[in-house]
A protein has these predicted regions:
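A membrane-topology feature that recognizes alpha-helical transmembrane segments
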Residues: 1-170
Length: 170
């Protein structure tokens, strides 16, 4: 790890902590709950969200480093949105469509930007294939064991697949 890698890792860890605190604040409003979910007990303070976002952001920065920083563009949104969606799913067993759509757009923009910056179209191709493969695997699992995963998961899995596969062969 070079000095530049250490600076990038530290900066993205701190940025992740700040984003995690903002996410935790947004979660505390319980704005994601529907009318029929308002009476459910409070999920608690969710102290783990800023720690999870910071750790995931720092680990991704450490993994890719300065040399491969464009690959952070499609993968960092997983660190930022993942704990947020997990906290909501743990509370109401549902993934909000608007948050999934925002996450999908951010990942798609990140994939496109990484492909343009590096001049490597294979990043976008790998992301598209990864998203499709992840969805097909989900679809098969849903047919084998119906009810094990919801369609919120089905909408989220291609996003994860696209972000993860965007960097698989770089």
């Amino acid at each position: 790890m070079t000095g530049s890698d250490l600076i990038l890792t530290t900066a993205l860890t701190v940025l992740g902590a700040v984003i995690g605190l903002i996410v935790r604040w947004r979660l505390a409003t319980l704005a994601y709950r529907r009318d029929d979910e308002v009476t459910q007990p409070s999920p608690g303070p969710r102290w783990w969200v800023p720690a999870a976002v910071a750790a995931a952001s720092g680990l991704l920065a450490w993994r890719f480093g300065v040399d491969r920083w464009p690959l952070l563009l499609p993968t960092l949104p997983l660190a930022w949105f993942g704990p947020w969606l997990s906290a909501i799913d743990l509370d109401v067993r549902r993934l909000p469509n608007r948050l999934l759509a925002a996450h999908g757009v951010v990942v798609a923009v990140g994939v496109g930007a990484a492909a343009l910056i590096t001049g490597d179209l294979s990043i976008a191709i790998q992301a598209a294939v990864g998203g499709m493969v992840a969805f097909v695997v989900f679809w098969i699992l849903d047919r084998v064991r119906p009810g094990g995963l919801g369609w919120g998961d089905g909408k989220y899995i291609p996003i994860i697949g696209a972000a993860a596969w965007a960097r698989c062969c770089f």
